[in-house]
């Protein structure tokens, strides 16, 4: 069977091996990225498709009758029309919980950047401001202590639990939304760790933000679609909340018109929470395990 990978670069820009997948197929073709108008020609008669973010529509599946298996390289698979796949007898798998430690680490890193302003102070030193200072230390913005601060967690799966574990080790008070909605919403930090569904898309709207504690910080390392970006931008500018730290946006990469770009108290990283080499290797390992299970008649991580 032939395998086509539509968007392999973000998983393996050249520092890993595709060998485990190559061992399971007759031919492996890897594209760094695939625009929508190239999807049909690149998939062609191949039986197996691997993708992360490409939109896999019913129309594409129907035009590729040889397609038998779609492997998502992510935990979320909103980009795949799973109902269409089920209707057409195409297996779909995902990779759950592979990035727990990395995403939790990045969540805490974003929180620490908000409280300690590491980047700001490094830039200040590199610009010579410490050399010109008459004191042995200085700070451009107040540095906040996390000990005793509260963290509200919305979405208490593997990542949410790991974030809670680290936060408690730092002396924070953790409020889990499913146990205490009011406590979570009124925390000093509110961190999103829930999947994106039709029901919760855009749930971080004006009402949500106004109900947060004044001066609180929103953190999102889950899915960009959970947040109404215009509402968040307006809330930040109006001072309803103290800041935001985001690793995901509704559109990735964002357009230059994204309302969150250029806002001083909004930190954005380019969806890098999952990218440590160990995590990307885990993706390839899990892809191979899922595919081998399907080839052997198994159901490992099936979502169709």
Cite the ranges covered by each PLM segment:
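Short beta->alpha connector loops at strand-helix junctions that form conserved
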Residues: 32, 73-74, 90-101
């Amino acid at each position: 069977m032939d395998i086509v990978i539509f968007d392999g670069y973000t998983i393996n820009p050249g520092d890993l091996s595709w060998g485990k997948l190559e061992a399971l197929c007759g031919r492996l073709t890897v594209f760094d990225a695939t625009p929508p108008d190239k999807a049909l020609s690149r998939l062609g008669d191949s039986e197996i498709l691997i993708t992360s973010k490409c939109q896999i529509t019913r129309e594409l599946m129907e035009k590729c009758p040889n397609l038998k298996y779609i492997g998502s390289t992510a935990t979320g698979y909103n980009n795949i029309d799973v109902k269409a796949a089920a209707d057409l007898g195409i297996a779909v798998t995902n990779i759950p919980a592979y990035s727990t430690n990395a995403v939790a680490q990045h969540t805490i890193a974003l929180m620490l950047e908000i409280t300690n302003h590491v980047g700001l102070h490094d830039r200040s030193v590199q610009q010579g401001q410490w050399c010109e200072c008459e004191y042995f230390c200085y700070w451009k913005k107040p540095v906040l202590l996390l000990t005793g601060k509260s963290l509200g967690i919305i979405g208490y799966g593997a990542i949410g639990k790991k974030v809670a574990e680290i936060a408690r080790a730092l002396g924070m008070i953790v409020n889990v939304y499913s146990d205490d909605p009011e406590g979570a919403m009124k925390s000093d930090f509110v961190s999103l760790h829930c999947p994106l569904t039709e029901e919760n898309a855009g749930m971080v709207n004006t009402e949500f933000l106004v109900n947060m504690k004044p001066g609180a910080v929103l953190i999102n390392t889950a899915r960009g679609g959970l947040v109404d970006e215009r509402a968040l931008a307006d809330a930040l500018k109006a001072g309803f909340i103290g800041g935001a730290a985001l690793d995901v946006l509704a559109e990735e990469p964002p357009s230059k018109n994204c309302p969150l770009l250029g806002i001083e108290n909004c930190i954005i990283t380019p969806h890098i929470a999952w990218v440590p080499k160990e995590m990307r290797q885990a993706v390839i390992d899990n892809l191979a395990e899922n595919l081998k299970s399907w080839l052997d008649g198994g159901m490992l991580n099936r979502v169709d």
